[in-house]
Amino acid sequence: MLQACKMEGFPLVPPPSEDLVPYDTDLYQRQTHEYYPYLSSDGESHSDHYWDFHPHHVHSEFESFAENHFTELQSVQPPQLQQLYRHMELEQMHVLDTPMAPTHASLGHQVSYLPRMCLLYPSLSPAQPSSDEEEGERQSPPLEVSDGEADGLEPGPGLLHGETGSKKKIRLYQFLLDLLRSGDMKDSIWWVDKDKGTFQFSSKHKEALAHRWGIQKGNRKKMTYQKMARALRNYGKTGEVKKVKKKLTYQFSGEVLGRGALVVRRHPPH
C-alpha cells in the first residue's frame, strides 16, 4: 500500500510520533472557566448580576395617557432647527459683507478724481517769442544766416555775403555793408557818407530790402523793415551800428568798416 502511494505521486504522511504530548481538552476547559468565568454557559451562578426588564411595566404617571400619544423619536423631523441654523448662517454672511460696501464706495470716489488731477499739470508748450525776429531765427535751418550768430565768415571768390544759396553765416550789418559796396539794391539803400560809414534806407523800397534779408535768413514768415530796424537798434549795444538822428539813417563803426575793406582787398569784385 505504501509503495502504491509513492508510485501514484501522493505525499506520504508518517504516523504520529510517540514523543508528541496528547491534547487534554479537560485541562483547557478548566482553565477557561477559572480565568473567564463569564464565558461559562452556566447562567444560574450569575443571576444576581442581571436586571430584570418587564416590557409591560409602565410608570404610574403615564398610565392616564393613551398609547397613541407616544411616538417614536426616529419619526420626529427637526424643521425648526434647520430654519434656525439657516437664519444664523445668513446673519453671519450679512455681517461679513457689510464692511466691504464702504471700501468699494471709497475706491470709486478716489478714481473719479484722477482725470481732474491730470488737468492740474501745466502744458509744456514753448514760450512765446519776444518778437517776430527771434521767432524767425529759431525756425530757420541751422546752416542759414542769422543775425544773432557770430561774425560772418569770408565768402569765397565770386560770391557776395548777401547772395542767396551761399550758405555762409552772416550778420545783418555785414549783409548791408556788402550791398552798399556792391551797388546791389541801390534803390533801397545808399551811402550818405562812405568815409564815415553813414548810410540811409529808402522810404519807398525799404520793405523790398527787408524781404531780401528774410530770404537770406530763411525765415518762413515775411520779414519787415520794422523787424530789421529792431535788430539794427540792438547793434547799438555792441557798437557795430548806431542810429543817427536823421530819419532812416545809420552809421557803421570804424571796426566794421576796416574789416569790410580788408575783405574787399582780399577778394576784389570781378
Swiss-Prot record:
Could you list the residue ranges forming a coiled coil in this record? none
The record's listing under SMART domains reads: ETS (SM00413)
Entry binding sites for DNA: K217, R230, R233, K243
Tell me which residues bear Phosphoserine.
S140, S146
Compartments (UniProt record)? Nucleus
Where's DNA bound on this chain? 170-253
Transcription as UniProt keyword: yes
Chief location bin: nucleus
Which GO terms of the molecular function aspect are on file? DNA-binding transcription factor activity, RNA polymerase II-specific; RNA binding; sequence-specific DNA binding
Query: What Pfam families does the annotation carry?
Result: Ets
Query: Which residues fall in a compositionally biased region of kind Low complexity?
Result: 153-162
Any GO CC annotation of this UniProt entry: nucleus
A GO BP term, please? cell differentiation
Does the keyword section mention RNA-binding? yes
Q: Could you list this entry's UniProt keywords, alphabetically sorted.
A: Activator, Developmental protein, DNA-binding, Nucleus, Phosphoprotein, RNA-binding, Transcription, Transcription regulation
Residue ranges, annotated region (Disordered): 124-162
Q: Tell me, how does this one assemble?
A: Binds DNA as a monomer. Can form homomers. Directly interacts with CEBPD/NF-IL6-beta; this interaction does not affect DNA-binding properties of each partner. Interacts with NONO/p54(nrb). Interacts with RUNX1/AML1. Interacts with GFI1; the interaction represses SPI1 transcriptional activity, hence blocks SPI1-induced macrophage differentiation of myeloid progenitor cells. Interacts with CEBPE. Interacts with IRF4/Pip and IRF8. Interacts with JUN. Interacts with RB1. Interacts with TBP.
Q: Which PANTHER family match?
A: ETS, TRANSCRIPTION FACTOR PU.1
Q: What is the annotated role of this protein in its UniProt record?
A: Pioneer transcription factor, which controls hematopoietic cell fate by decompacting stem cell heterochromatin and allowing other transcription factors to enter otherwise inaccessible genomic sites. Once in open chromatin, can directly control gene expression by binding genetic regulatory elements and can also more broadly influence transcription by recruiting transcription factors, such as interferon regulatory factors (IRFs), to otherwise inaccessible genomic regions. Transcriptionally activates genes important for myeloid and lymphoid lineages, such as CSF1R.
Protein name per Swiss-Prot or TrEMBL = Transcription factor PU.1
